[in-house]
Regions:
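S-adenosyl-L-methionine/SAH cofactor-binding core of RNA-modifying enzymes
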Residues: 86-137, 142-143
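Glycine-rich beta-alpha loop elements in corrinoid/cobalamin-binding modules
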Residues: 146
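A contiguous pocket-lining binding segment that forms or flanks enzyme active sites
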Residues: 150-152
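N-terminal nucleotide/polyanion-binding subdomain common to many enzyme families
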Residues: 2-4, 9-101
Length: 152
């Protein structure tokens, strides 16, 4: 069964080897980093990490809150229904990432309104040396994050 599954997967050597020796760096900004760690060790992503093709890091947005309860949610700026992720912890997490990387990575907010992830889109994203992926929660993120930080 495993051999049949492996035969169906695309070969890394033919389609995804990076030309430069530096691995692509992807940082995931999330409220649930423990979920990321488990998933990123498996399958194609896990093998890419083992081969040094990609460096994946999960950042806990709660680590950047300023209150003792590590609160990340608030009512939407300007009013509205539900709760959204606050600007401050996301901003501080992203600034720490920029300082660590030495530049602003291409920043993508993952949401139902975003682009569909196709093979062609993956090829486009592979051109970036650094990607940061923001995982939303609640009713989404404060609109100021999208306007000020997010590239897509």
């Amino acid at each position: 069964m495993r051999q049949a599954q492996k035969a169906m997967e695309p070969a890394f050597d033919q389609t995804t080897e990076r030309i430069d020796s530096k691995p692509m760096r992807i940082d995931i900004l999330t409220l649930f980093p423990e979920m990321c760690d488990t998933v990123l060790r498996e399958s194609i992503i896990g093998r890419a990490r083992e081969r040094g093709l990609v460096e994946l890091n999960c950042r806990n947005i709660r680590d950047y809150t300023l209150d003792k309860h590590n609160r990340v949610d608030d009512t939407p700026y300007g009013g509205g229904m539900g709760m959204v992720m606050q600007t401050q912890p996301i901003y501080d997490c992203f600034q720490a990432l920029c300082g660590e990387v030495g530049r602003k990575p291409h920043f993508i907010y993952l949401s139902p309104q975003g682009k569909v992830l196709t093979q062609n889109r993956v090829r486009e994203l592979a051109e970036y040396e650094n990607l940061a992926l923001l995982c939303g929660h609640y009713e989404g993120v404060d609109e100021r994050v999208i306007e000020e930080l997010v590239d897509e």
